[in-house]
């Protein structure tokens, strides 16, 4: 009898422990080593850290970094992160500062990555890799040499890949082709070799008079493409102007994952180039 009672007590204890473990697992807060302000940063952390750090991205790649409404689950992840890496342009964004405040994480290390230029440009991307490796080394000094070694290799890969992309663009005869483009794409479009006649901001911020001026400038210059930015929200501006300008509208992305099957920097830059060359070919066919 005593033996049966003891077995019953042990079984009850085991069941209780399993139930407790299940509850804790279901309700455990997300744990992230590094929260990233963009997919660009998150991808680089993965490369530099060799996939050994858990990362999450605060801002989805297909949305505007300054206008995204951060979700409670993302704030909870930030509350349980050791560090938060952001672009220098994000440090004044209300959605970012608000998320940091709402996370209420006194131990959170915020690293601002001071890199100038469009991160889709190979040289800028390589600089971002270096800055992220340095920041990771400051947080995890025991792994600093490992991070730096990975960063050096990754930067070399990026620059070499960029040369191949540049060759594709030159073969596509983009040098000197006149375009108008979104301000947020000017760095990449200029690097690609296009002649930027004018730039424009977010479509909802443009007045009818500004749109009319853009059309006039584009008509006078004889632009071939109107290049929109995916993350600016509306991608209809170019489409609405192309008939007046006799140009082709195309939308490209500033972040890996913004367009389908572009989860890495290489895939994202290749997709952008594909779209630009396709649009240029379309313009050449209709123009001539």
Give, region by region, the residue ranges found by the protein language model.
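Helix N-cap/beta->alpha junction signal
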Residues: 38, 88, 182-183, 230
């Amino acid at each position: 009898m005593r033996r049966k009672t003891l077995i019953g007590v042990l079984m009850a204890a085991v069941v209780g422990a399993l139930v407790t473990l299940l509850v804790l697992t279901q309700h455990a807060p997300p744990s992230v080593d590094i929260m990233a302000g963009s997919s660009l940063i998150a991808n680089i952390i993965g490369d530099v850290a060799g996939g050994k750090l858990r990362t999450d991205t605060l801002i989805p790649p297909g949305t505007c970094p300054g206008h995204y409404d951060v979700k409670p689950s993302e704030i909870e992840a930030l509350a349980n992160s050791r560090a938060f890496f952001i672009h220098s342009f994000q440090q004044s964004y209300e959605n970012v500062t608000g998320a940091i405040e709402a996370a209420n994480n006194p131990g959170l290390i915020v690293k601002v990555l001071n890199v100038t230029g469009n991160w889709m440009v190979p040289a800028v991307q390589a600089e971002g890799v270096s800055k992220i490796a340095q920041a990771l080394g400051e947080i995890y000094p025991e792994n600093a040499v490992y991070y730096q070694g990975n960063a050096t290799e990754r930067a070399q890969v990026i620059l070499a890949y960029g040369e191949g992309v540049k060759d594709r663009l030159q073969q596509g005869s983009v040098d000197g082709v006149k375009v108008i483009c979104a301000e947020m794409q000017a760095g990449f479009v200029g690097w690609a070799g296009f002649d930027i006649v004018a730039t424009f901001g977010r479509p909802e911020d443009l007045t009818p008079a500004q749109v009319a001026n853009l059309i006039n400038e584009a008509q006078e210059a004889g632009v071939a493409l109107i290049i929109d930015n995916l993350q600016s929200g509306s991608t209809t501006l170019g489409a609405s102007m192309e008939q007046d300008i006799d140009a082709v509208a195309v939308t490209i992305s500033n972040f890996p994952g913004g367009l389908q099957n572009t989860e890495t920097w290489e895939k994202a830059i290749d997709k952008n180039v594909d779209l630009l060359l396709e649009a240029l070919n379309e313009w050449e066919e209709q123009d001539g």
